[in-house]
Curated annotation (Swiss-Prot):
A cellular-component GO term for this protein: glycine cleavage complex
Function comment: The glycine cleavage system catalyzes the degradation of glycine.
Highest taxon in the source lineage: Bacteria
HAMAP family for the chain: GcvT
Pfam family, one: GCV_T
Record-linked InterPro entries: GCS_T, GCS_T_bac, GCST_C, GCV_T_N, GcvT/YgfZ/DmdA, GcvT/YgfZ_C, TrmE/GcvT_dom1
Lineage of producing organism: Bacteria, Bacillati, Actinomycetota, Actinomycetes, Mycobacteriales
Keywords of this entry: Aminotransferase, Transferase
One biological process term in Gene Ontology: glycine decarboxylation via glycine cleavage system
Signal peptide interval: none
This protein's record includes keyword Transmembrane: no
Family, similarity comment: Belongs to the GcvT family.
Protein name: Aminomethyltransferase
Enzymatic reactions: N(6)-[(R)-S(8)-aminomethyldihydrolipoyl]-L-lysyl-[protein] + (6S)-5,6,7,8-tetrahydrofolate = N(6)-[(R)-dihydrolipoyl]-L-lysyl-[protein] + (6R)-5,10-methylene-5,6,7,8-tetrahydrofolate + NH4(+)
Amino acid sequence: MSDAPELMQGPLEDRHRALGASFAEFGGWLMPVSYTGTVSEHNATRNAAGLFDVSHLGKALVRGPGAAEFVNSALTNDLRRIGPGKAQYTLCCNESGGVIDDLIAYYVADDEIFLVPNAANTAAVVAALQAAAPSGLTITDLHRSYAVLAVQGPRSTEVLAALGLPTEMDYMGYADSSYNGVSVRVCRTGYTGEHGYELLPPWESAGVVFDALAAAVAEVGGSPAGLGARDTLRTEMGYPLHGHELSLDISPLQARCGWAIGWKKDAFFGREALLAEKAAGPRRLPRGLRMVGRGVLRPGLTVLNGSTPVGVTTSGTFSPTLQIGIALALIDTDAGVEDGQQITVDVRGRAVECEVVRPPFVEAKTR
């Protein structure tokens, strides 16, 4: 008998199986990886629209007098930059400046902030906030209360309009709406680099919304897309993935996420450590690698400048858009590696030539 914990499942597994999905574990969840193939789903998203079920993402609610003020004193970004109807990328750090998680904070009201962390880190984020919260505030884990459906791509607005859902929000804005009697929070957010939306219907009613979105996506020439395409899309954009480009050992500064830190704030988790690192300068930074020849790079490979190890790959894939192998790598800042320079990556004892570039690998079209 296996002692492995049973994988959690989203609310739409039967629908994914009916669509021919293949599945894999991600963050403790059984998730659809692909339907017709990662490359075709990637291209459908770049050229028309992709429909992603990312209900494994966490959800949590901070509620009570001073909720916004408390979240602002805990998470890195300055919540005072936004207000109700807006969302913000931010980070939850430990006192050493390591990243417990990166997440999206939705400003509902001064006394209500809705959070969407990564699946595997939800409990840790909730625990960190609960440990610091003053009396009168509640931090509630709502992981299975809401599904998350992402519609991404240049024709995503047409898809939502076909369902009568709001589309006029600015990037990182959101609006509460409904479809066929089901309440839906519609957010102008995403993880693909394309114009897109993320929708949060109630967990138990997600199928109604998913079915309608799937039909509308097909009408514009798009398709359902799995986590395989989500990863190739985000890697082309150079977006960090926790556990790869961000972790307890990889700080926001080392991930070039200093823009998501409110440096003028009096308090946030990890502030002193991050201020010290900012003053000294991060010891390593993410760079992009484009393979010169054929092949695919994977995480955990040694990057060399000549014969000297200077870093390690954190993500790697074949880019369907560029038709080459690409990777993200953490490179030592004192190694003197410049954009445009040729370096090598050790792939099972073979030196693979790559060009150093500054991500993103393709142009962002989020706005």
